[in-house]
């Protein structure tokens, strides 16, 4: 359930990139041919919009032009993060920008610039994006705990200082012994009560447990006696203005080869074979799936 979606059927999707084919007469921020992220289908009589990126054509909103014109444009804040990609960036890399910008901006909101040790729970694309972005921000000692050996191997390729198979009790104990209230930051990309509680064993005084995952259900349930002198911060939802600010550094990192998109995108399909892409996600054989029109 997502509270922003109140009517079904709905068009899902927000991790998309496409070329501008037509612009309105008052548009100043985009031109035909620009590669732009986060286009989407708006609400209409047939479908509601759950960001609406799963479509061949979408709409972007010129936030700057609307503000300058003092225009009343519905959902204009969506335009804050609908940004132009640099010349030479491929659409596949551009489609990864959303995950990377959301995680990079979350790290900025948490405040990690002077931190030394980070633990990430989870080994999916969001966890690996946090790893990549934290490395860009200067954190060198980053550990990843997950349940899939192949994805942990990818984490090592992306620069993790160490990885642990979370479902293996022996490896889990090694992690507990290593982190034992010594981590500056714990990033929970799963968001269950179990994983939040697991972070309690790792975080040091004045540290921060940052919950990004959405799996905690209706209620947060953690043992109160364990809550001592650290923060639990929820960063599950991006702040558009902060996400927009990190567009350039994330784009630069991709263009400079500091983030290897090929380590994230494991499956590519034509839109005609979209069911294969969804199945790869369901089977957990994929990290990121790209569907091309």
Language-model segments: residues:
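Glycine-rich beta-strand-centered segment in the early N-terminal region that forms part
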Residues: 1-52, 64
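NAD(P)H dinucleotide-binding glycine-rich loop of Rossmann-like/cofactor-binding domains
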Residues: 5, 43-121
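Hydrophobic beta-strand signal
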Residues: 17, 36-37, 59, 119, ...
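Mid-domain Rossmann-like dinucleotide-binding core that forms the NAD(H)/NADP(H) cofactor-binding site
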Residues: 87-168
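Glycine- and other small-residue-rich loops at beta-strand/loop junctions that grip anionic moieties
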Residues: 92-95, 119-123, 143-145, 164, ...
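Glycine-rich cofactor phosphate-binding loops and adjacent beta1-alpha1 units
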Residues: 110-114, 153, 157-232
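C-terminal hydrophobic helical "lid"/dimerization subdomain
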Residues: 149, 197-200, 205, 244-293
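C-terminal substrate-binding/catalytic core of Rossmann-like NAD(P)-dependent dehydrogenases/reductases
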Residues: 172-177, 218-267, 275-276
